[in-house]
């Protein structure tokens, strides 16, 4: 295991070679920082992508364990999360990396099946509770605020086997049970809670295209054994939204007054730019938002689905009962978590027929997502085929959310740059990640601009601290500030780690918050 002294030597060498390059890349023309002293700068992770130890100390099988083992061909490199970054055994080393970066927060998630191997149909795994207690305590000891997500795509396989997980209202009970246990055991120290990560993205991949477990879909969206892409995504989303409200109800009525924390939800966002100035394309861009991020955020904030969805889907969209609407309005989020990576052009498919593609169907809002407008790209393409670099779209997205949701506090819970490891890619090339630095620099400048516009943003978490298991990409796409050798699990800081460290130092003085 790498020692702290080795980290110090590596960062010293980078600091001698890198400062001139770094200083040229960031800072807008206005060098004043809009970040207040209590702003959270951190990195983000998730349990399945990081922990490994997939059957260690009483952990049960989860949906991703089963999916990756039974369908290795669905993962680009045929890999799984059995070991991942092995953070379960190496979290102290990773906390040293965070501490050296100067971050004052770390976003992590709870492995549902590590705490409750069989959901509410089995016993609590107190070895799992102990692991998270140790991790939380170690973070706090170093002055790093834990920002904890209750559910980040993974759940006990038992719940899929019993009642098809998110397709059943029973899942709301199980999620409430998990939330109660986590608040009880960790809430005296955890003051920032996220209920569910990216319900919109999770549902689209699991129940529309069938690319994520439980791999349910129908033609023409995907080729699955079971599922209905026209109806099941909306059923699953309905249950996730109500499970979110259930968790907040438990926190508000049993824990928040004493524990004095806050709780919210995370959605995936993309900026949707109309491909022309026509009214049809402008309306389509708004529909695209309604069928993507607003699908989740409108019920969470206003207790109802967006009008565009109601008008277009009719009876295919579940309805909230009066009691459910009351619950949503009574137990609102304290903040919104915003994950953001890219932008798209949007072409209307409601009035004018257009080619099939992402967004073009009725269940997706009849708003086709495109990355080009004639010969003009929405932004430079990264190694990840869905990610284009468009910092101005990020600024527009934050202002859109500010205006639509009355400037409720926001945290940028994920933002990062993906780099593909090709057969010819060298470790040296991965460590000298200048494209990632340019991406982060542009998006953080856009964040500054949005905050000067008045967006009420309270924190920023780079995705990700480490290279990790990136779902369908396996270990072939790297988002980390630290390189991971997945044979030895050695962590090595990339140039972007030094850049992010310098950015934090230059924008917020948080040294008094960190126990060096």
Swiss-Prot record:
It is an enzyme of class 3 (hydrolase). Expressed in roots and stems. Glycans are attached at residues 223, 375. It comes from the Eukaryota. Disulfide bonds join 217-224, 349-354. Gene3D superfamilies: Glycosidases. GO terms for biological process: carbohydrate metabolic process; lignin biosynthetic process. Residues 1-22 form the signal peptide. The active site is at 198 (proton donor), 414 (nucleophile). InterPro entries: Glyco_hydro_1, Glyco_hydro_1_AS, Glyco_hydro_1_N_CS, Glycoside_hydrolase_SF. PROSITE patterns: GLYCOSYL_HYDROL_F1_1, GLYCOSYL_HYDROL_F1_2. Keywords: Disulfide bond, Glycoprotein, Glycosidase, Hydrolase, Signal. A beta-D-glucoside binds at residues 49, 152, 197-198, 341, 414, 463, 470-471, 479. One of its GO terms (molecular function) is beta-glucosidase activity. It catalyses: Hydrolysis of terminal, non-reducing beta-D-glucosyl residues with release of beta-D-glucose. Pfam families: Glyco_hydro_1. Its EC number is 3.2.1.21. Hydrolyzes p-nitrophenyl beta-D-glucoside, p-nitrophenyl beta-D-galactoside and natural glucosides such as salicin, p-coumaryl alcohol glucoside, phenyl-beta-D-glucoside, coniferin, syringin and arbutin. May be involved in lignification by hydrolyzing monolignol glucosides. Belongs to the glycosyl hydrolase 1 family. This is Beta-glucosidase 46. It comes from Arabidopsis thaliana (Mouse-ear cress). The gene is BGLU46.
């Amino acid at each position: 295991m790498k020692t702290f002294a080795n980290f110090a030597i590596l960062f010293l060498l980078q600091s001698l070679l890198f400062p001139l390059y770094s200083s040229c890349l960031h800072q807008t023309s206005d060098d004043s920082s809009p970040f207040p002293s209590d702003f959270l700068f951190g990195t983000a992770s998730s349990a399945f992508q990081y922990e490994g130890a997939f059957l260690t100390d009483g952990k049960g099988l989860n949906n991703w364990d089963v999916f990756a083992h039974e369908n290795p061909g669905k993962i680009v490199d045929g890999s799984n999360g059995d070991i991942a970054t092995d953070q379960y055994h190496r979290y102290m080393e990773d906390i040293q990396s965070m501490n050296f970066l100067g971050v004052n927060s770390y976003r992590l998630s709870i492995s549902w099946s590590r705490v409750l191997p069989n959901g509410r149909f089995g016993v609590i795994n107190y070895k799992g509770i102990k692991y998270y207690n140790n991790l939380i305590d170690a973070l706090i000891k170093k002055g790093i605020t834990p920002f904890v997500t209750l559910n980040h795509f993974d759940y006990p396989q038992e719940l899929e086997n019993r009642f098809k997980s998110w397709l059943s209202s029973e899942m709301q009970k199980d999620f409430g049970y998990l939330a109660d246990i986590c608040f009880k055991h960790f809430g005296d120290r955890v003051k920032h809670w996220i209920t569910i990560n990216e319900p919109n993205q999770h549902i689209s991949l699991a129940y529309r295209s069938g690319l994520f477990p439980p791999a349910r879909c129908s033609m023409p969206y995907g080729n699955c054994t079971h599922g209905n892409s026209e109806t099941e995504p909306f059923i699953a989303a309905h249950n996730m939204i109500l499970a979110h409200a259930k968790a907040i109800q438990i926190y508000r009525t049993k824990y928040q007054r004493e524990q004095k924390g806050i709780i919210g939800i995370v959605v995936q966002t993309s900026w949707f730019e109309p491909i022309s100035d026509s009214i049809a394309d402008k309306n389509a861009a708004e529909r695209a938002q309604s069928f993507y991020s607003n699908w989740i955020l409108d019920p969470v904030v206003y207790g109802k689905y967006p009008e565009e969805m109601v008008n277009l889907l009719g009876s295919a969209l579940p309805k909230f009962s009066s009691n459910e609407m009351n619950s949503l309005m009574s137990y609102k989020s304290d903040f919104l978590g915003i994950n953001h990576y890219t932008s798209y052009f949007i072409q209307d498919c409601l009035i004018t027929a257009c080619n099939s593609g992402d967004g073009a169907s009725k269940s997706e809002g009849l708003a086709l997502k495109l990355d080009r407008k004639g010969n003009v790209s929405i932004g430079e393409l990264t190694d990840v085929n869905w990610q284009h670099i468009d910092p101005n779209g990020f600024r527009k997205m934050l202002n859109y959310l500010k205006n639509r949701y009355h400037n409720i506090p926001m945290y940028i819970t994920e933002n990062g740059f993906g780099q593909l490891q090709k057969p010819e890619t060298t470790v040296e090339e991965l460590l000298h990640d200048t494209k990632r630095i340019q991406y982060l620099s542009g998006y953080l400048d856009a964040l500054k601009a949005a905050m000067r516009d008045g967006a009420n943003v309270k924190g920023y978490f780079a995705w990700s601290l480490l290279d990790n298991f990136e779902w369908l990409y396996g270990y072939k796409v790297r988002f980390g500030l630290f390189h991971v050798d997945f044979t030895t699990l050695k962590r090595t800081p990339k140039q972007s780690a030094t850049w992010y460290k310098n950015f934090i130092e230059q924008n917020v003085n948080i040294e008094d918050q960190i126990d060096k």
